[in-house]
Amino acid sequence: MDLKKIAADIPDYQQFLTVDELNDSSHRLREQYPDLVSIRNIGRTRSGDPIELLTVAGGADCAFVFGGPHPNEPIGCMTIEYLSQRLCEDGPLRAELGYTWHFIKSIDADGMRLNEGWFKGPFTPSNYARHFYRPARREQVEWTFPIDYKTLSFNDPLPETRALMRVIDETKPKLLYSLHNAGFGGVYYYVSDECPALYDTFHQIPEWFNLALDLGEPELSFAEPYAPAIYRMLTSNDMYDHLERHGVADPGSVIGFKASSAQYAERHGSFFLIVEMPYFDEPRVNDQSVTSSKRRDAILQAMDIAIEHDNWIRSQHSSVVCELKLDTPVRRALEDFLAMSADFREADREWVLQAEETNRPATQAELFSNLYTSRFYKLLNTGLLARMLRDEIAGGNGSAAVASASAMATVRLDEDGRALEAALDYRAIPIRSLVGVQCCAGLAAAAYLNS
């Protein structure tokens, strides 16, 4: 398998496809390759739309790939758009890999429609934040699988999650590929098991597309690295144990997340892969030069900035909560963020102060993660607040308090967005590069599992 040739063939996509455009494309593919492609409904979304499983027939082993595990993550939808077409066109590749491929292009289609406002550009942090939606924890398809761990017990999956469970149980995939993406930074990976034979390939693939590995702070402080930018897949059990180790009496009451698709697929021995891709990058995301700042101080500074920002959002929300009329997904997402216990942050603060690995000079990448990448994610929360208030006004809420809070949230969103963009030497990464890394990494993993 010539991965570099596959990488070179990926089209220069200029925009993300909407849910309807993705569905239409799947049906055209079936019409074009009726002997290879089948589509069947395996459930319905919460709003009643069909959830379609696209299958490209092949060998006895199964790979199950699903996009949009969080609805603000359409990169994987485009990866499936390309990969499903390529597998149909390329018989030798299909035969060499020896898999039957099952795809769901967008598993949270209802939520993805709420993000489509930025899918056609302009691709800037500010525009992304303005149209951003990521569900409350209880409404996240990827994190509402059943679990029974210590005091964390749950068995009421969302309809979309039940659809994933059904496909995992039917296909027992050798490879389960959940196509997540981050927002800002570099490329990094999660795998369910150590796989040293893949590490060099995983490190090389981003270079083919002029992308950098993310060598700054891990997504969560307790992530276990197998190699630079390659981590063991995190589970809700890990989150629970982290909180428990650092003084939280009952993590099950505050964690919010349930089990993930990776945890559910353990029963079938599936190899699980995530390739986290950013929309935006910056030269400092993998700069390993050492600074004069201590890593511990940088992490604590980022925490203090986050607390100030969270308190501002909380105060804006509390000033109008009695005036709000609509129960929307955006409102539930914002209020879930506000309700999230400070136990997470306090547990991390305790880890920072105790862990010897934080008591050293920070690299430029680590400093960038703490002081700039963190600001990008705070901007998204401001965007949720501004959007919730816009929705209220558009829905006929004439409250003066809501109008005032909406104006203030919009001003802060615009000002913080401009300030962040001015402080960064960022670029919007070409969509073909994002698709390329996910596609090539997935094919490399599939070949590795059958080697």
Language-model regions, residue ranges each:
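C-terminal accessory segments enriched in acidic
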Residues: 1-16, 160, 196-451
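Catalytic metal-binding/acid-base residues of hydrolase active sites
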Residues: 70, 108, 182, 219, ...
